[in-house]
Amino acid sequence: MSERNDRKVYVGRVVSDKMDKTITVLVETYKTHKLYGKRVKYSKKYKTHDENNSAKLGDTVKIQETRPLSATKRFRLVEIVEESVII
């Protein structure tokens, strides 16, 4: 049980929902430069399993690490934190 709780959890923004049951989530993190101490923004995209196709473009979502579901998918959708507003 404790092993399941040690899985990585990220919060990011959906940048693509064109695939069936798959979304692409952009996760932005900050790291401090070792020499200069300046915070530098890094971003990474994760393909995420969305069983019900519930997440839409621009939504803020929480994803969790899981077993490999395909060649590129290693995360699953936990919840939609905030839905995007379409103007």
UniProtKB/Swiss-Prot annotation:
Disulfide bonds: none
GO molecular function terms listed in the Swiss-Prot or TrEMBL record: rRNA binding; structural constituent of ribosome
Keywords from the named record: Ribonucleoprotein, Ribosomal protein, RNA-binding, rRNA-binding
Pfam families recorded: Ribosomal_S17 (PF00366)
Statement: the UniProt record of this protein carries the keyword Transcription regulation: no
GO BP annotations, alphabetical order: translation
CDD domains, sorted: Ribosomal_uS17
Superkingdom as given in the UniProt entry: Bacteria
UniProt cross-references to Gene3D superfamilies, sorted A to Z: Nucleic acid-binding proteins
CC terms in the record's Gene Ontology section: cytosolic small ribosomal subunit
Family label: Belongs to the universal ribosomal protein uS17 family.
Function description: One of the primary rRNA binding proteins, it binds specifically to the 5'-end of 16S ribosomal RNA.
Subunit structure, interactors included: Part of the 30S ribosomal subunit.
Protein name: Small ribosomal subunit protein uS17
UniProt organism field: Staphylococcus saprophyticus subsp. saprophyticus (strain ATCC 15305 / DSM 20229 / NCIMB 8711 / NCTC 7292 / S-41)
Taxonomic placement: Bacteria, Bacillati, Bacillota, Bacilli, Bacillales
